[in-house]
């Protein structure tokens, strides 16, 4: 796939990854591409549909023949699961014209539970204990809310005193191709991968940003040896999904100045491409995340923060958000702060 859509140094123009992918696939002879996904989940940020899962869009834009299949056997939950029945309920509501605010059916449910505020802290303490922490997640509607939850969990439940410590779980929030060798099992550090901080060695401020040298392990690749990387601290509590375009441009230009003694422009760019500060890993804490960030992952215990429901009916985007959040769970769903009119009992 061309670097325009994948590499961090392309900060001055926007490119369409799907366009680049289709160009790459069909530049070969007799090539095919398979897109797999759930059309009821949240579409990419800033869009109302998932283009790669929309046959009409693909035919119109790329003039290709499309074959569609639908998988209907659930593998993540048992057929008797309340998580499954509520996910199915919401999915059906997405296809209906009238969207009732009675989203959740709590009748005889033991795995989809309303949590009263008086019991929330005790429940979180139990769920974020050492032997359960990797199986718990709070799903919330904004990075600002996620930051608040992450701060409270680290301070009041995990008793973390410093900005980042050994034992912290973090999510990579932007693909990184620098720190892992290509022949490793993972291949690269992917947006959405969960890591554990094994050790923190050094903090520094340079290029107008703050960095730390840390040792990490990849939770999804237990055979991968711990890895020494440099992370950028500014993204951790930012209210944006990752380092913004302007900040990325600022970092690029600052790093570029370190190599201004090199006369050839292409050679200066090559130096930036392998610079550890420019390639610093972008991360956020992984105790609470936005719904978009949780897509593709699964946890035993999913706490769903209240998604503001103020009208008599829900719009489709809100239902997609709730459906995506519910389907992250393999065991239990806890509903935080939802008013009574959201439930069927």
Residue ranges and their predicted role:
Residues 2-14, 47, 77-78, 312:
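Flexible beta-alpha connector loops of hexameric P-loop NTPases
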Residues 16, 20, 25-33, 39-198, ...:
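Conserved helicase motor core of P-loop NTPases
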Residues 206-345:
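C-terminal accessory regions
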Residues 13-16, 119, 283, 317:
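Short secondary-structure boundary/capping elements
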Residues 2-8, 107-111, 278, 304-310:
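Short, basic, glycine/proline-bearing loop/turn elements
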Residues 1-3, 37-39:
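Walker B catalytic acidic pair
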Residues 1, 170, 302:
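Receiver (REC) domain switch-region micro-motif
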Residues 34-35, 138, 304, 335:
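Structural beta-sheet core signal
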């Amino acid at each position: 796939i061309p670097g325009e859509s994948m590499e961090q140094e392309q900060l001055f123009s926007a490119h369409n990854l799907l366009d680049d992918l289709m160009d790459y696939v069909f530049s070969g002879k007799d090539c095919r591409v398979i897109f797999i996904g759930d059309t009821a989940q949240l579409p990419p940020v800033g869009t109302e549909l998932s283009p790669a899962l929309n046959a009409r869009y693909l035919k119109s834009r790329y003039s290709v023949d499309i074959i569609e299949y639908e998988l209907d056997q659930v593998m993540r939950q048992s057929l008797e699961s309340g998580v499954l029945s509520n996910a199915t309920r919401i999915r059906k509501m997405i296809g209906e014209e009238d969207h009732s605010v009675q989203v959740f059916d709590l009748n005889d449910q033991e795995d989809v539970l309303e949590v009263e505020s008086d019991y929330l802290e005790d429940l979180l303490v139990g769920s974020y204990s050492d032997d359960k922490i990797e199986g718990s997640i709070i799903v919330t509607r904004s990075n600002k809310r996620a930051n608040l939850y992450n701060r409270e969990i680290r301070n009041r439940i995990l008793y973390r005193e410093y900005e980042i410590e050994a034992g912290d779980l973090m999510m990579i929030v932007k693909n990184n191709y620098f720190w892992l060798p290509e022949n490793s099992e993972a291949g690269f550090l992917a947006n959405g991968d969960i890591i554990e901080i094994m050790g923190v060695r050094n903090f520094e401020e340079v290029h107008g940003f703050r960095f730390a040298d840390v040792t990490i392990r990849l939770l999804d690749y237990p055979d991968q040896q711990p890895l020494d990387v440099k992370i950028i601290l500014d993204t951790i509590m930012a209210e944006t999904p990752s380092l913004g375009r302007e900040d990325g441009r600022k970092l690029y230009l600052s790093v570029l100045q370190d190599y201004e003694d090199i006369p050839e422009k292409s050679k200066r760019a090559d130096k930036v491409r392998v610079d550890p500060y420019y390639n610093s890993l972008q991360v956020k804490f992984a105790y609470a995340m936005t719904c978009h960030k949780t897509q593709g992952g699964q946890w035993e215990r999913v706490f769903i923060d209240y998604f503001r429901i103020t009208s008599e009916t829900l719009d489709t985007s809100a239902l997609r958000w709730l459906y995506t959040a519910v389907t992250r769970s393999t065991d239990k769903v806890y509903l935080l702060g939802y008013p009574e009119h959201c439930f069927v009992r």
